[in-house]
């Protein structure tokens, strides 16, 4: 129906970006990155279900499954660089707050941020 605005039945919001000039030591520290992701889930009002991490060369990948979707961090310490993706379903969550918490904890001097509304109308 044209002109009718309906409320999405599924609220999906994704915040993702690239972080530059990050703290090199944090980017290498698996345990610290896991702690950051756990706290980001709390800050974003998400329910952490599981977290896995892998050391890949000097870098680290952390993948957290939250009840509402996921949080990921991938790091490249040799470039002081990381990528972050926070995707959540549910109006009660705040992926932007979770993303910004990670930006601050990695001490990024600059970053890009992208936001996508992935809500659906059935």
Swiss-Prot record:
Pfam families: AdoMet_dc. Gene3D superfamilies: S-adenosylmethionine decarboxylase. The modification Pyruvic acid (Ser) is found at residue 69. Binds 1 pyruvoyl group covalently per subunit. InterPro entries: AdoMetDC_fam_prok (IPR003826), S-AdoMet_deCO2ase_core (IPR016067), S-AdoMet_deCOase_pro-enz (IPR017716). It catalyses: S-adenosyl-L-methionine + H(+) = S-adenosyl 3-(methylsulfanyl)propylamine + CO2. One of its GO terms (molecular function) is adenosylmethionine decarboxylase activity. The keyword Lyase applies. The record marks 68-69 as: Cleavage (non-hydrolytic). Its EC number is 4.1.1.50. Is synthesized initially as an inactive proenzyme. Formation of the active enzyme involves a self-maturation process in which the active site pyruvoyl group is generated from an internal serine residue via an autocatalytic post-translational modification. Two non-identical subunits are generated from the proenzyme in this reaction, and the pyruvate is formed at the N-terminus of the alpha chain, which is derived from the carboxyl end of the proenzyme. Its cofactor is pyruvate. One of its GO terms (cellular component) is cytosol. One of its GO terms (biological process) is spermidine biosynthetic process. The active site is at residues 69, 74, 89. Keywords: Autocatalytic cleavage, Decarboxylase, Lyase, Polyamine biosynthesis, Pyruvate, S-adenosyl-L-methionine, Schiff base, Spermidine biosynthesis, Zymogen. The keyword Lyase applies. Pathway: Amine and polyamine biosynthesis; S-adenosylmethioninamine biosynthesis; S-adenosylmethioninamine from S-adenosyl-L-methionine: step 1/1. Heterotetramer of two alpha and two beta chains arranged as a dimer of alpha/beta heterodimers. Catalyzes the decarboxylation of S-adenosylmethionine to S-adenosylmethioninamine (dcAdoMet), the propylamine donor required for the synthesis of the polyamines spermine and spermidine from the diamine putrescine. Belongs to the prokaryotic AdoMetDC family. Type 1 subfamily. This is S-adenosylmethionine decarboxylase proenzyme. The gene is speH.
């Amino acid at each position: 129906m044209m002109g009718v605005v309906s409320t999405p039945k599924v609220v999906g919001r994704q915040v993702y970006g690239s972080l530059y000039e990050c703290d090199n030591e944090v980017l290498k520290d698996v345990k610290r990155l896991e702690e950051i992701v756990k706290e980001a889930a709390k800050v974003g009002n998400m329910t952490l279900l599981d977290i896995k991490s892998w050391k890949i060369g000097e870098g680290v990948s952390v993948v957290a499954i939250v009840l509402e979707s996921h949080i990921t961090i991938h790091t490249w310490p040799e470039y002081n660089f990381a990528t972050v993706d926070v995707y959540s379903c549910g109006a009660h969550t705040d992926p932007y707050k979770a993303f910004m918490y990670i930006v601050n904890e990695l001490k990024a001097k600059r970053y890009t941020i992208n936001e996508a509304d992935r809500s659906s109308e059935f």
